[in-house]
Design a protein with these regions (language model features):
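Internal catalytic-core helix/loop-beta-alpha segment
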Residues: 96-125
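Short, flexible, mixed-charge acidic loops at enzyme active sites
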Residues: 81-92
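A short, structured active-site edge motif that brings together acidic residues
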Residues: 65-81, 158-161
Length: 180
């Protein structure tokens, strides 16, 4: 059985790809390492964004493991232009999975991208995997396994957050393990 820990990054100093963790986010990354260290993680995979890589760095150092970077785990781009009412725009993309704004990515496309990354990891012979990504993409990946995940689930995510996907053959059980 594969246990895949889907991790939302710790608190960042901004939203762009290069934004680092805040000092509070750095402390959260240490707490995240304390938690994940006990779960039999053998493989670390991260979004290319700095905040995701910095969130898993303390665990990588402790376990002496490299962090694989997978661009499919990057956050979903909602729009090329900043949106004044971005929260409402995200809500609408959970209602209409094919809605796409100029320069953006639909929920359906982002979900397929994230799910492809997860399926590739599930196909590997590893018992425990920590995968660090971002809130919107994480919720869409969770939705690909359980359609009850939507806008409200996205709103309830914390920084960091951890969901466990326990896979055996084609069956996957989803459970929140961080703060649960």
């Amino acid at each position: 059985m594969t246990r895949l820990f889907l991790v939302r990054h710790c608190v960042p100093a901004g939203r762009d790809a290069a934004a680092p963790l805040t000092p509070a986010g750095q402390l959260q990354a240490i707490a995240l390492a304390d938690y994940l260290e006990t779960l039999g993680v053998e493989l670390l995979v991260s979004s290319p964004y700095a905040r995701a890589q910095q969130s898993i760095a303390p665990l990588a150092r402790r376990l002496g493991l490299p962090v694989e970077i997978d661009p499919r785990l990057a956050e979903r781009v909602l729009s090329a232009a900043p949106l004044e009412h971005w929260r409402e725009a995200i809500r609408r993309t959970f209602e209409d999975l094919d809605l796409v704004r100029p320069g953006g990515e639909s929920s359906r496309t982002a979900m397929a991208r994230g799910r492809a990354a997860i399926d590739a990891l599930r196909a590997r012979s590893v018992r425990g995997v920590a995968v660090v990504t971002h809130g919107n993409l994480m919720t869409l990946v969770l939705r690909s396994f359980d359609t009850r995940f939507g806008f409200q689930a996205w709103e309830r995510l914390s920084n960091p957050d951890v969901y466990c996907l326990e896979a055996e053959a084609e069956r996957v059980r989803v459970s929140r393990t961080w703060g649960a």
